[in-house]
């Protein structure tokens, strides 16, 4: 209803101003601004729904002030371009309509009415309401009844008798199991669901709507609200350190806790969370690559579900035979948005919907088959009688190719339990949410029936039943939940440990690199993650007087305040204010101690603008003073005009990447010398090793041969045509995820470049 009202007010404002208000520059500008805000808000809501499937939530609010980088972002480039072009067209059309009767005399009353209607359209829009509620949630002091509902359980289970297998299905919400809506999509896992305790109304609440948040909610009974963006949790050294979570209770009760997934454990800090709460045995892509049958059989995120679940089965067998009490948690990935992935061993590789193949539905059908195969192995084993199997989605599906069909249904998360000791077949329609999962499992295992804000759905009353406005209530508790981190409120001294790549202050520890906004009563950490902008872009959003401490590689801040460190990959500390004074200190000891020193100086807005503009220079446009191209730092020497076909800097150098260009091209500002030596320090990747690699300057071509280890080769060139471009052509670029950012499409690697130097020869 509010959507229709806001649109009606918007339309009325446009028509009244266009036909009745007449000509006045001030009223035109004011009305266009407010109407433009309405358009921006609604496009933001549309775009947010496209990315998250959940409107404007915490993750979107974070992204609006940073950037959307990371997993699968290339799939969204075209929609993003479409939104920008559409926004430009709408603004142009809106301005043209409002000025249709600009030759008519100005009418104050109609101008005022049009502006008030425009303001009303903004106020009534769902986008404005969602953003307002999110902003309020950032500044509230909390809710006094939080302590009454947040309950810590006993730290042990009195007499544990059952092992636990807990399967998180990536985005595998219960909606997929509606056979009337999606016929024969999930027959294998659906049949198993119907044999157990099936909880049919599991809500998704704020702070539980992405993987690490869903894991925290299900194991600790609280949403993931933090003093930083949740997916940046990889930078912290401990995760809700004061909370008692399911893993802690299991460990205290004699369980050995295992976690197996196909993706990198560091992503979003899953390793930190699990290690902080009772898990001593973790297996991700790095740990599995030496034990899986085919280490090259991977998707954009890591190992396919069939590989991961095979390893989980082997671990289940091993642990069951040992007689040791254990829990085994596993997380699938093949159903990850936007398209999903199809394991090669499943029979269900294709699912048609609306008369055509649908990749997301196909991935769901394949993944559920793999999960069902794993469960059936456990059920057929002699150890099933001592086992509880839990299957749940980590969160509702985000925007994928099935999302518009899911939204036509009543959407709920998946949560069902299969008991080997006491078979129970029942569908329970009680209202509940993801935070109740851990408490329900704890209850089944013989522990308490509460865990944080979670309650057992077998013997307790969920917050979703107690509060009709549970989503608003959850946001009201956000400050209380953030306080559970026990995060410091001041920063006076700090210590950097170069060996561990950590910074410590006021009892807290963070992984480097790190940016901190420091005020009198608050220290706000801004870590760098797959989903966040680089720290220098985040710093560019600071106000002129905001105090900052920035710990990063020296070359990243050198272009601003320390040009002598432009080629240094050591750690440096910069602090100050963007509109005031800044200092840069080189971290030159293994254990380096520093102090914050913020001076209350006069703010120079010209200096501020210059700093912001420099911080926002993209990597490939950065230039430094050097007589060679150093590839382990961002940018290029001042003599280089532009370059292409080269991937991002890594600690050793950079790979060529045929996804960015079939050839490595380095164009210099001036012609290369008539005679010169080209000194190349590099290595080859895969099948490019020991093969001739063409290197061209103008019409002359030399051949470079590299091995898998870094070597230095000198090639002699004559350049009679005054060519200014160097071209290197890797013969067989290899598609691989090695060293890739998690979730990005594979790179096509050819040669790895450490340094290229042009040395003029006499004569």
Curated annotation (Swiss-Prot):
Its EC number is 2.7.8.20. The chain crosses the membrane at residues 1-21, 26-46, 77-97, 108-128. Pathway: Glycan metabolism; osmoregulated periplasmic glucan (OPG) biosynthesis. Keywords: Cell inner membrane, Cell membrane, Membrane, Transferase, Transmembrane, Transmembrane helix. Transfers a phosphoglycerol residue from phosphatidylglycerol to the membrane-bound nascent glucan backbones. The keyword Ribonucleoprotein does not apply. It is found in: Cell inner membrane. NCBIfam families: PRK03776.1 (NF003000). It catalyses: a phosphatidylglycerol + a membrane-derived-oligosaccharide D-glucose = a 1,2-diacyl-sn-glycerol + a membrane-derived-oligosaccharide 6-(glycerophospho)-D-glucose. This is Phosphoglycerol transferase I. HAMAP family: MdoB_OpgB. One of its GO terms (cellular component) is plasma membrane. CDD domains: LTA_synthase. Belongs to the OpgB family. GO terms for molecular function: phosphatidylglycerol-membrane-oligosaccharide glycerophosphotransferase activity. PANTHER family: LIPOTEICHOIC ACID SYNTHASE (PTHR47371), PHOSPHOGLYCEROL TRANSFERASE I (PTHR47371:SF3). It is a multi-pass membrane protein. The gene is mdoB. It comes from Escherichia coli O127:H6 (strain E2348/69 / EPEC). It is an enzyme of class 2 (transferase). One of its GO terms (biological process) is glucan biosynthetic process.
């Amino acid at each position: 209803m509010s959507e229709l009202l806001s649109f009606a007010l918007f339309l009325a404002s446009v028509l009244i101003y266009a036909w009745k208000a007449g000509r006045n520059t001030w009223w035109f500008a004011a009305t266009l601004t407010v109407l433009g805000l309405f358009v921006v808000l609604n496009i933001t809501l549309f775009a947010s729904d496209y990315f998250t499937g959940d409107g404007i939530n915490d993750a979107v609010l974070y992204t609006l002030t940073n950037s959307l980088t990371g997993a699968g972002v290339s799939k969204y480039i075209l929609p993003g371009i479409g939104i920008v072009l559409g926004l430009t067209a709408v603004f142009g059309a809106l301005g043209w309509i409002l000025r249709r009767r600009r030759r008519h005399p100005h009418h104050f009353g109609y101008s005022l009415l049009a502006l008030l209607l425009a303001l009303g359209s903004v106020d009534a829009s769902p986008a404005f309401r969602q953003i307002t509620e999110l902003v309020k949630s950032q500044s509230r002091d909390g809710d006094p009844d939080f302590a009454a509902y947040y309950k810590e359980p006993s730290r042990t289970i009195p007499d544990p008798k059952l092992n636990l297998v807990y399967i998180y299905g990536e985005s595998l919400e219960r909606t997929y199991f509606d056979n009337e809506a999606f016929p024969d999509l999930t027959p294998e896992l659906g049949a198993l669901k119907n044999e157990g305790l099936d909880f049919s109304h599991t809500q998704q609440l704020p702070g539980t709507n992405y993987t690490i948040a869903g894991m925290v909610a299900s194991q600790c009974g609280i949403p993931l609200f933090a003093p930083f963006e949740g997916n940046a949790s990889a930078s912290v050294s401990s995760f809700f350190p004061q909370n008692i979570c399911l893993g802690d209770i299991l460990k205290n009760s004699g369980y050995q806790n295992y976690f197996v997934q196909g993706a990198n454990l560091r992503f979003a800090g899953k390793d930190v969370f699990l290690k902080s709460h009772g898990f001593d045995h973790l297996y991700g892509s790095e740990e599995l690559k030496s034990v899986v049958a085919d280490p090259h059989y991977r998707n954009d995120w890591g190992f396919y579900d069939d590989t991961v679940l095979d390893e989980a089965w082997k671990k289940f067998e091993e642990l069951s035979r040992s007689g040791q009490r254990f829990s085994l948690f596993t997380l699938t990935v093949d159903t990850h948005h936007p398209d999903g992935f199809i394991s090669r061993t499943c029979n269900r590789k294709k699912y048609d919907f609306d008369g055509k193949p649908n990749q997301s539905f196909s991935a769901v059908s394949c993944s559920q088959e793999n999960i069902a195969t794993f469960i059936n192995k456990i059920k057929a084993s002699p150890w099933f009688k001592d086992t509880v199997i839990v299957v749940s989605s980590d969160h509702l599906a985000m925007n994928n190719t099935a999302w518009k069909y899911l939204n036509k249904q009543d959407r709920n998360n998946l949560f069902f339990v299969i008991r080997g000791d006491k078979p129970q077949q029942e569908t329970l329609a009680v209202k509940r949410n993801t935070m109740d999962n851990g408490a329900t499992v704890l209850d089944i295992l013989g522990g308490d029936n509460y865990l944080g804000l979670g309650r057992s759905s077998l013997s307790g009353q969920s917050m979703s039943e107690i509060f009709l406005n549970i989503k608003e209530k959850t946001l009201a508790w956000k400050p209380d939940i953030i306080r559970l981190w026990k995060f410091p409120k001041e920063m006076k001294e700090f210590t950097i440990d170069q060996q561990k790549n950590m910074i410590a202050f006021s009892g807290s520890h963070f992984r480097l690199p790190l940016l901190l906004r420091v005020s009198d009563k608050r220290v706000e950490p801004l870590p760098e993650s797959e989903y966040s902008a680089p720290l220098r872009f985040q710093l560019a959003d600071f106000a002129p007087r905001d105090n900052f401490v920035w710990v990063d590689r020296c070359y990243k801040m050198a272009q601003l305040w320390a040009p002598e460190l432009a080629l240094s990959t050591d750690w440096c500390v910069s602090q100050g204010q963007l509109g005031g004074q800044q200092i840069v200190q080189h971290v030159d000891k293994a254990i380096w101690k520093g102090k914050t020193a913020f001076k209350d100086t006069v703010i120079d807005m010209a200096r501020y603008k210059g700093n912001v503009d420099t911080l926002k220079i993209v990597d490939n446009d950065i230039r430094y003073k050097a007589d060679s191209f150093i590839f382990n730092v961002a940018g290029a020497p001042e003599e280089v005009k532009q370059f292409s076909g080269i991937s991002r800097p890594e600690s050793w150098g950079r790979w060529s990447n045929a996804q960015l260009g079939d050839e490595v091209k380095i164009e210099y500002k001036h012609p290369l010398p008539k005679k010169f030596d080209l000194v190349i320090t590099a290595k080859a990747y895969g099948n490019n090793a020991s093969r001739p690699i063409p290197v061209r300057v103008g019409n002359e071509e030399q051949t470079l041969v590299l091995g898998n280890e870094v070597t230095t080769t000198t090639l002699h060139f004559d350049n009679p045509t005054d060519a200014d471009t160097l071209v290197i052509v890797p013969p067989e670029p290899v598609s691989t995820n090695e060293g890739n950012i998690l979730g990005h499409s594979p790179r096509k690697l050819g040669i790895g470049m450490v340094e290229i130097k042009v040395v003029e020869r006499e004569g």
